[in-house]
Amino acid sequence: MINIIECDDYEVAKNLVLDYSKIKGAEACFVSLDKELSDLEGFYKGGALLLGYENEKPIATIAIKKINDDMAEAKRLYIKPEYRGKGYARHMLDAMLDKCRELKYKEVRFTTKPEVMSIGYALYKKIGFEELENNDGTVLMRMMLTL
C-alpha cells in the first residue's frame, strides 16, 4: 500500500526527480531541471510536492506548480520501476487532484510525451484529462476541476 504525504524531505524528492530525469526520451521534460532542483520548495510555492512511500521507503513523486490563481500544472509523476503495476500512479494522481481542489485551482494542466510515457498518457486520459494540443509529440492536457 502506498502512503502519500506532502514533502517533508527535499533531498528525498530531489533524488526521485533525478531518477525520473534519466528516463530515455524524456530529456525535453527537464529543460529547467537545475533551477528546479536548486530550490524545490520555492519552485513549487503555491502548489505542492507529494511523495509516495511503501513501507517507509520513498518510491513515488508528483508535483503541483502554480501557474496563476485558477490554474496549476501537474509535474514529475514518477514511480520507481520496481513498484510499477500496483496502481500507485492512480493513487498519486488522485492525491494531486485532491490537493489542487484544496488549493482552489479550477484547472490542472499536464504535459507529456505519449511515445515515451504511453502508460501514463493512457491513465491521464482514463481519469479525465483532455488533450489540448500536440507539438511534435509533446502533448498538453488539462482537466477542469469542480471544487
Description of each model-found segment:
Residues 28-31, 35, 83, 87, ...:
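Residues at secondary-structure transition points
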